[in-house]
C-alpha cells in the first residue's frame, strides 16, 4: 500500500542513484535510433545552482526525458567552464585569506597548480547540484573546457584561424580591468549610475587664431550677437584623459566652427598642438558642440581618431596610473588623484569655464567592482565579420531557427554590426595562447612548442630563442567550440559523426551574442553546418512583483532550499508551467507550494485507485470498454497525449504543463474518479472490473506524460504500482512514450459525459458566485428537455444529485420563481436558490464589487494612457499594470454576468 504522503527527501536521492546506475542517462545504442542531442550551457566551475540555472536545466531535462521515452538516442552532454577570471579570483582570494603569498610572487606554474588543486576539491559542486535537480545528463561524457581533449581543439582552431588570416594581432581599445590587469568582455562590464560632473575646459586656439562665437539668438534661433573668442570649449566627465587628447572634433555642418576646421589648439598643461577636425560624431546640440578626442581612452574617440588620422597616446599603466607619456609631475599618479589635480590646476589657471553636476553611467568590472578603462593595447582578434556571414545565412535560411522567433532580430542586429572579437586575456588560468615571439618581431603560431621551433628554424635557417605569449584565451573562445569539441573534434569520432549537429540549444537571451552567435560561427566554419537545429531562448526569472532578483534587494530564491522544502518535482513543474514564450517568469514560493499540492493530488489519486483495487490487467485493451465514463476518459487521455506531445515537440513548455495539469487535476481526479465511485461501490461486477482496469491504464499514461516534468514522484508511483498486476519491463525513465489512436475518441460518450460535467460545473459556479452555503441542497427544475436530455437525466440523476449537492431533479413546464438559470443544451435548468440567500444583499455585494473593479480599471487605464508613465516606468512595472487591468476586466465581466443571473432570481 502506498504511504499516506510522498517523501521527496528520501525518494529523490534513491531514485537518482538508481537511474544513473542503470545507465538510463546514456543514449540508446541502437544505431538506427534517431539522435536527440542537447549540449548543456556549461556553468562556471566556480558556480552554484541559482534559479536561472534551475529553469534552464529543467527545460533541457524535460526535452531529454521526453525524447528518450520516444525511443530516440537522447544525449544530454554535461560539462563545466573553466571560467578564467572568476576562478582565478576565487583562488587568489583563498590564498590571501590563508595568508599565502600573492599570485605574482608565487609564479605562474605554482599558481596554476593551486587552481587545479582547488578545482579537484571544490569544482564539482554545481554538477552535484544539477543531480539534485534531477538532470538526466550522461555523466560518463562530462567535459571541462580545460581538459586535454578540449585544449587540443582550442589550439587547433586558433592555429587554423591564424593561418586562414581570420585571426590576427592588433593594437585596439579594450575594456581594461585595472584590478585584475586584463581585458574583459562586454558581458563582464556592469554599468552603474554615479554622481559625477561635466567639466567644461577652454582650450586656447593656436597661432593667434580667433573666431566669432554666437552669444544671443532671435526667436527663430538665428544668431544676433557674437563675441570674439581665442579658445574653444570642450566638456568631459574624465578630466585626467585630457593629457592624452590629440584632437578636437566639431560637426561638419556646425556653422559656429566651420572656419576652425584644420586649425589647431594648444592642449593645456601638455602644450601639444592638436588639430580641430570635422566629424559627424560631434553633436552640435550637446554642450558647446565641440568634443575633445582621446583615441587611446575612449571607444568613440578611437573611431574619430582612425578617420581623422590622429595619434593615439596611451597615458595609463595597466594599474590605471599615469605613465611617462604625461608631464613628469603627473607620472605615477592614480587616475582619480590626477583628475582632482587637473581640475584644481584648470581652476587656478582660468581655463575651467564651468562644472555641471550630473548623474551618468560608468562602466565597472562585474567581479572587481572597479571602474573600467578603455585601454589601448596589443591583443589577439578574430575576424568576426567574415565568420559572421555564414552564421547569418544559417538563420536567414532556416537551417537554425530561434524560439521565440523574435530573438532572431536580436541575433541579426548583433551579427550585422559585429566588431573584431578580442580573444586574449591577461590572466594565468585558461588556454595559453599557442603563439611564440621570435627575433625581428616574428610570430610563430603553432599547436605545440616543437612545431613553433621547427617553423622558426625553417624561417631563420638556425635555432633561435622563442618566448610563448603570456596571455590566455577568452573563456568564450573555448565555449564557442563546445558543440563539437565535446564530441571529440578534431578527431573523427563516432560520437561526432552520430551526434553533430545537435538538436536544440536551451539558453538565456543575455548570451545570444557572446555564446550562441560564436558557436554558430565556429561550428559552421569547422564542421560545415550549424551546431544546432533550434535555439530555444528561455525567460528571465524575476520575483513575484516582476523585479529582477538580486542579493542587494533580498529577493533571491535559492532553488536548492526550495527543493529541500517543497521537493524537486514542485520546483520543476512550476518553472515549466511558467515558461511561456516571450514573457519573464514571476516566481513566488506560494506558486511552488501550489504545484506541490498538484503532486499531492496525483499521489492521493493513486492511493484512491489502489484502495479500490484499480490494478493493471495483463492484456487490457482500452478499445473494448463499454461504460460511457470509461469511453470518455479513454478519449480525454487520447486528446491529452496528442496535446502534450505536440507542445513538447515545439517546444511550448507552458502549454504542455497546462494540458497535464488540467487533465490530471480536473479531468481525471475531479471528474473521472468521482464519476467512477458509484460503479466501484456498486454490484455490477463487469462494470467494476472494466472501470478498475481503465483507471489503472489511465493512471499509467498519466505517469508517462508527467515523467519529463515531475520525474521523481512519477517514477516512485511507477515502482510502487508495479507491486500489483504484471511486472514492469523497465523503469519509467526508459518506458515508451504513449501513442494512442484517434479513433479511441468516442463522440457519443464525449457528448454525454461532457453534458454531465458541464451541467455540474455550471451549478457549482452559480452556487459559488451567489454564496449558496455548501450545506444547502437546492432543487433543480428542468424546462423544455428533449428525449436525449431526458434519457441522460434518467441515467445520471443520482450523480447530479451527489456532485451538484441537489435536493431533487424534476421536470416542469416553467421555471419556478426565485431560481437561477442553468444552461443545459436545448433545455433550461432552474436552480432554486432564493430560499438559501439574501438576494438584496447579494445584489448589493456584487454591485459594490463591480464598482471596485471599475475604479481599478479606470485608475490603471489612466496610468497606461499616460505617455510619461510609459516612458519613465520600468518594463516590469508597465507589464504588471497591464496584467492588473486584464485581471480587473475579467473579474468585472464575471461579476456582471452573476448580477445579470441574480436578476432572474428576484
UniProtKB/Swiss-Prot annotation:
Family designation: Belongs to the class-I aminoacyl-tRNA synthetase family. ValS type 1 subfamily.
Assembly behavior: Monomer.
NCBIfam families: PRK05729.1, valS
Annotated Pfam families: Anticodon_1 (PF08264), tRNA-synt_1 (PF00133), Val_tRNA-synt_C (PF10458)
Transmembrane feature ranges: none
Residues binding ATP, per UniProt: 551
UniProt-recorded name of the protein: Valine--tRNA ligase
Residue runs in coiled coils: 842-905
Renumbered ranges of motif 'HIGH' region: 43-53
Compartments it resides in: Cytoplasm
GO biological process, one term: valyl-tRNA aminoacylation
Function summary: Catalyzes the attachment of valine to tRNA(Val). As ValRS can inadvertently accommodate and process structurally similar amino acids such as threonine, to avoid such errors, it has a 'posttransfer' editing activity that hydrolyzes mischarged Thr-tRNA(Val) in a tRNA-dependent manner.
InterPro entries to which the protein is assigned, alphabetical: aa-tRNA-synth_I_CS, aa-tRNA-synth_Ia, Anticodon_Ia_Val, M/V/L/I-tRNA-synth_anticd-bd, Rossmann-like_a/b/a_fold, tRNA-bd_arm, tRNAsynth_Ia_anticodon-bd, Val-tRNA_synth_C_sf
Domain of life: Bacteria
EC number(s) on file: 6.1.1.9
Motif ('KMSKS' region) on chain: 548-552
Lineage: Bacteria, Pseudomonadati, Pseudomonadota, Alphaproteobacteria, Caulobacterales
Domain remarks in the Swiss-Prot or TrEMBL record: ValRS has two distinct active sites: one for aminoacylation and one for editing. The misactivated threonine is translocated from the active site to the editing site.
Keyword vocabulary terms for this entry: Aminoacyl-tRNA synthetase, ATP-binding, Coiled coil, Cytoplasm, Ligase, Nucleotide-binding, Protein biosynthesis
Amino acid at each position: 500500500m502506498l504511504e499516506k504522503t510522498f517523501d521527496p527527501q528520501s525518494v529523490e536521492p534513491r531514485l537518482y542513484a538508481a537511474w544513473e546506475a542503470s545507465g538510463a542517462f546514456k543514449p540508446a545504442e541502437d544505431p538506427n535510433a534517431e539522435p536527440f542531442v542537447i549540449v548543456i550551457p556549461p556553468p562556471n566551475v566556480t558556480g552554484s545552482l541559482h534559479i536561472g540555472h534551475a529553469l534552464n536545466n529543467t527545460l533541457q531535462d524535460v526535452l531529454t526525458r521526453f525524447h528518450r521515452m520516444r525511443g530516440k538516442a537522447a544525449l544530454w552532454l554535461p560539462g563545466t567552464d573553466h571560467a578564467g577570471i572568476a576562478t582565478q579570483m576565487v583562488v587568489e582570494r583563498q590564498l590571501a585569506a590563508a595568508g599565502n603569498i600573492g599570485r605574482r610572487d608565487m609564479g605562474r606554474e605554482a599558481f596554476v597548480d593551486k587552481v587545479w588543486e582547488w578545482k579537484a576539491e571544490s569544482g564539482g559542486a554545481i554538477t552535484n547540484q544539477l543531480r539534485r535537480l534531477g538532470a538526466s545528463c550522461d555523466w560518463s561524457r562530462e567535459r571541462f573546457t580545460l581538459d586535454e581533449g578540449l585544449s587540443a581543439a582550442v589550439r587547433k582552431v586558433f592555429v587554423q584561424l591564424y593561418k586562414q588570416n581570420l585571426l590576427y594581432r592588433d593594437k585596439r581599445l579594450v575594456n581594461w580591468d585595472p584590478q585584475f590587469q586584463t581585458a574583459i568582455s562586454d558581458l563582464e562590464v556592469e554599468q552603474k549610475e554615479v554622481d559625477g560632473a561635466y567639466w567644461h575646459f577652454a582650450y586656447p586656439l593656436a597661432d593667434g587664431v580667433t573666431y566669432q562665437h554666437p552669444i544671443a539668438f532671435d526667436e527663430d534661433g538665428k544668431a544676433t550677437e557674437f563675441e570674439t573668442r581665442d579658445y574653444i570649449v570642450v566638456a568631459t566627465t574624465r578630466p585626467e584623459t585630457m593629457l592624452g587628447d590629440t584632437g578636437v572634433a566639431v560637426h561638419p555642418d556646425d556653422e559656429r566652427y566651420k572656419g576652425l576646421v584644420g586649425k589647431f589648439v594648444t592642449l593645456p598643461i601638455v602644450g601639444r598642438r592638436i588639430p580641430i577636425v570635422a566629424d559627424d560624431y560631434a553633436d552640435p546640440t550637446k554642450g558647446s558642440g565641440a568634443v575633445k578626442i582621446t583615441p587611446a581612452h575612449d571607444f568613440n574617440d578611437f573611431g574619430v581618431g582612425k578617420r581623422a588620422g590622429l595619434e593615439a597616446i596611451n597615458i595609463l599603466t595597466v594599474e590605471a596610473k599615469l605613465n611617462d607619456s604625461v608631464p613628469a609631475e603627473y607620472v605615477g599618479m592614480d587616475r582619480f588623484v590626477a583628475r582632482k589635480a587637473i581640475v584644481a590646476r584648470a581652476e587656478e589657471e582660468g581655463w575651467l569655464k564651468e562644472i555641471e553636476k550630473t548623474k551618468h553611467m560608468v562602466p565597472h568590472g562585474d567581479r572587481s567592482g572597479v571602474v573600467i578603462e578603455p585601454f589601448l593595447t596589443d591583443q589577439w582578434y578574430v575576424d568576426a565579420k567574415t565568420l559572421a556571414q555564414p552564421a547569418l545565412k544559417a538563420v536567414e535560411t532556416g537551417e537554425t531557427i530561434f524560439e521565440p522567433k523574435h530573438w532572431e532580430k536580436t541575433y541579426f542586429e548583433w551579427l550585422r554590426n559585429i566588431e573584431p572579437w578580442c580573444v586574449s586575456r591577461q590572466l594565468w588560468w585558461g588556454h595559453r595562447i599557442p603563439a611564440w615571439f621570435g627575433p625581428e618581431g616574428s610570430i610563430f603560431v603553432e599547436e605545440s612548442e616543437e612545431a613553433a621551433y621547427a617553423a622558426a628554424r625553417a624561417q631563420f635557417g638556425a635555432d633561435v630563442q622563442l618566448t610563448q605569449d603570456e596571455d590566455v584565451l577568452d573563456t568564450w573562445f573555448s565555449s564557442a567550440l563546445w558543440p563539437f569539441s565535446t564530441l571529440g573534434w578534431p578527431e573523427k569520432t563516432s560520437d561526432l559523426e552520430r551526434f553533430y549537429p545537435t538538436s536544440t540549444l536551451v539558453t538565456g537571451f543575455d548570451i545570444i551574442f557572446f555564446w550562441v552567435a560564436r558557436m554558430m560561427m565556429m561550428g559552421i566554419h569547422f564542421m560545415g553546418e550549424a551546431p544546432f537545429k533550434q535555439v530555444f531562448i528561455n525567460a528571465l526569472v524575476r520575483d513575484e512583483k516582476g523585479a529582477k532578483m538580486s542579493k542587494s534587494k533580498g529577493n533571491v530564491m535559492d532553488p536548492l532550499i526550495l527543493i529541500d522544502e517543497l521537493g524537486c518535482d514542485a520546483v520543476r513543474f512550476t518553472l515549466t508551467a511558467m515558461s511561456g514564450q516571450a514573457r519573464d517568469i514571476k516566481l513566488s514560493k506560494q506558486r511552488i507550494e501550489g504545484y506541490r499540492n498538484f503532486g499531492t493530488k496525483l499521489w492521493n489519486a493513486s492511493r484512491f485507485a489502489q484502495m479500490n483495487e484499480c490494478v493493471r490487467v495483463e492484456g487490457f485493451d482500452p478499445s473494448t470498454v463499454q461504460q460511457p465514463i470509461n469511453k470518455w476518459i479513454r478519449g480525454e487521455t487520447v486528446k491529452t497525449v496528442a496535446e502534450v506531445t505536440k507542445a513538447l515537440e515545439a517546444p511550448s513548455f507552458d502549454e504542455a504543463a497546462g494540458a497535464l495539469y488540467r487533465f490530471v487535476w480536473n479531468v481525471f481526479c475531479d471528474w473521472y474518479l468521482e464519476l467512477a465511485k458509484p460503479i466501484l461501490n456498486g454490484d455490477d461486477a463487469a462494470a467494476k472490473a472494466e472501470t478498475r482496469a481503465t483507471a489503472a491504464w489511465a493512471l499509467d499514461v498519466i505517469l508517462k506524460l508527467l515523467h519529463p516534468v515531475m520525474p521523481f514522484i512519477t517514477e516512485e508511483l511507477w515502482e510502487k504500482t508495479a507491486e500489483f498486476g504484471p511486472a514492469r519491463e523497465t523503469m519509467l525513465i526508459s518506458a515508451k512514450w504513449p501513442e494512442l489512436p484517434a479513433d479511441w475518441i468516442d463522440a457519443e460518450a464525449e457528448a454525454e459525459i461532457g453534458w454531465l460535467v458541464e451541467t455540474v460545473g455550471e451549478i457549482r459556479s452559480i452556487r459559488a458566485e451567489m454564496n449558496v452555503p455548501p450545506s444547502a441542497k437546492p432543487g433543480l427544475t428542468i424546462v423544455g428537455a428533449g428525449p436525449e436530455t431526458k434519457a441522460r437525466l434518467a441515467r445520471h440523476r443520482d450523480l447530479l444529485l451527489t456532485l451538484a449537492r441537489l435536493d431533487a431533479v424534476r421536470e416542469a413546464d416553467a421555471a419556478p420563481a426565485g431560481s437561477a438559470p442553468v444552461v443545459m443544451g436545448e433545455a433550461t435548468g432552474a436552480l432554486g436558490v432564493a430560499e438559501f440567500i439574501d438576494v438584496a444583499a447579494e445584489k448589493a455585494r456584487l454591485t459594490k464589487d463591480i464598482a471596485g473593479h471599475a475604479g481599478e480599471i479606470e485608475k490603471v487605464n489612466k496610468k497606461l494612457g499616460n505617455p510619461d508613465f510609459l516612458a519613465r516606468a520600468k518594463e516590469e512595472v508597465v507589464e504588471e499594470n497591464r496584467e492588473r487591468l486584464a485581471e480587473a476586466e475579467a473579474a468585472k465581466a464575471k461579476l456582471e454576468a452573476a448580477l445579470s443571473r441574480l436578476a432572474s432570481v428576484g
